[in-house]
């Protein structure tokens, strides 16, 4: 069985992500041990909270360069919610901060007259073919909770949702690095399909 590490950097509910993979028959390890992460076949970067806190914690646990190194080595990486946002070059939550720089773009406040945070079920619109969306269709619904959104180039946009008048990247990716703004682990059967597709690419 492939070794998958859910990176523990004191951000978010890691157990719910672990349980979602277990329902697919895939065991995972929750760890911040550098050697364990280095030996992993794939990495999961969950996250709930603020961009600066996430980057501070990644730095505190000496994880920034290691994640960048594993990404450059072609190891599949899946970022979820805040974990997706820190994959980008820069974030503007509370203060301007550098991200991991694995994807092009920035993380900015959602600019809409709708209620913030964007919370609840919303539809996906598929922007381009990708192994990540192999089992998905337009209008599939997934669960979001966020106040900030990524901006990214079209070639890294896999699926998006709309909230009011705003187009929000929902699945982004380049090569072995994938991010989901929504929570697959809270998105029922559709979320299960996203994680299943990710596992099949490892």
From Swiss-Prot:
GO MF terms, alphabetically ordered: glutaminase activity; imidazoleglycerol-phosphate synthase activity; lyase activity
Name this protein carries in UniProt: Imidazole glycerol phosphate synthase subunit HisH
Enzyme Commission no: 4.3.2.10, 3.5.1.2
Subcellular location field: Cytoplasm
Active-site residue list: 81 (nucleophile), 183, 185
Domain Glutamine amidotransferase type-1: 3-202
PROSITE patterns documented for this protein: GATASE_TYPE_1
Organism phylogeny: Bacteria, Bacillati, Bacillota, Bacilli, Lactobacillales
Reactions that this protein is recorded to catalyse: 5-[(5-phospho-1-deoxy-D-ribulos-1-ylimino)methylamino]-1-(5-phospho-beta-D-ribosyl)imidazole-4-carboxamide + L-glutamine = D-erythro-1-(imidazol-4-yl)glycerol 3-phosphate + 5-amino-1-(5-phospho-beta-D-ribosyl)imidazole-4-carboxamide + L-glutamate + H(+); L-glutamine + H2O = L-glutamate + NH4(+)
GO cellular component terms, semicolon-separated: cytoplasm
Keywords attached to this entry: Amino-acid biosynthesis, Cytoplasm, Glutamine amidotransferase, Histidine biosynthesis, Hydrolase, Lyase
Assembly information from the UniProt record: Heterodimer of HisH and HisF.
InterPro entries: Class_I_gatase-like, GATASE, Imidazole-glycPsynth_HisH
Name of the gene encoding the protein in the UniProt record: hisH
Protein function: IGPS catalyzes the conversion of PRFAR and glutamine to IGP, AICAR and glutamate. The HisH subunit catalyzes the hydrolysis of glutamine to glutamate and ammonia as part of the synthesis of IGP and AICAR. The resulting ammonia molecule is channeled to the active site of HisF.
Domain of life of the source: Bacteria
